[in-house]
Structure formats: C-alpha cells, structure tokens
Amino acid sequence: SSDLMDEDTCMVDMARYFLNFTRDESCGKCNYCRIGTKRMLEILERITNGEGQDGDIELLEELAMKIKDGSMCGLGQTAPNPVLTTLKYFRNEYEDHIYKKKCTAGSCKALISYTITDDCKGCTLCAKHCPVDAISGKVKEKHVIDQSLCIKCGKCMDTCNFGAIEKK
C-alpha cells in the first residue's frame, strides 16, 4: 500500500485541491456555497502562490463557518471541512506560507528555490539539463542558478551526481 500523505504533502495545497473540487461540483443555488467557496479558494491560491496576507487565516475560518451554517445542501455544509481540519492540525503550515513565505513540504513552487552548494564540481550537467538556461558557470567552477529564470522543475537536482543542489 502507498501513503496518500507524507512529509512531502503540503496541507495548504491539499486543502486548496479539495476546495477546488467542491467548488466545481457546486450547483450554485445558494450564495454561501457558490460565492463563499470561490472566495476561500482565491485565498488559498494566494497563500500557495506566496502572496498570503496577515488576516487570511482568520478570514478562511470566518468564511468556512458561514458556508457551513448557510449552505442548503450537504456539499456546501462539508466543503469547508478540509480547510478547517488542516487549519486545526497544521496551522503552522499556513503560518509558514504566509509569514515566512515557505512551504515546509517543498511543493508550492512559488515558495521554493533551488541553490547550488559548494559541493558543485562544475561538471555542467545541471546546466545542460535546465530547460530554461537558468544555470550558468564555467567548467570545473561552481555554477549559479538565476532565480528569476528558474521554473523550479527540479531537473537540475535530479541530474546532479554530486548532491550539490538543494531545494529550499
């Protein structure tokens, strides 16, 4: 059997995923479900994109309770549950996303970066495999990743034979 969640699972992104699904399934008849889930999803997308703001957690909690109480059907009444549950048990992940601009699981691309350590031998393998030419450096010298060009695909890390690329 395989685990559905582990330390590489971002709970904020998981809540966003489930809320996106329930929003898509909403019939749209009641405002709480139709508009409320849309607003919650916008906040979660902002947080996972590294644009979370002070007050987002409280706003998510407030919207979640109003949606639960005001929705007319089971879907709307349960739609906020993944957000409420992850806030209850993994609140620190939300706080890390918002205040530290960090995804502990390393899965929210906007909140991660790849860096080349001093273990780099200058073999150029990472640069050759980078699809956007974000890595530069001379043969046998430490290479550098241009963060403004990096698309965070991880190919550099996968191809480095020296373990010289870190995901932060």
PLM ranges: what are they?
Residues 1-4, 165-167:
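Generic detector of short, aliphatic-rich beta-strand segments that form the cores of beta-sheets
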Residues 31-38, 116, 125-144, 155-168:
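Iron-sulfur cluster-binding cysteine motifs and their immediate structural context
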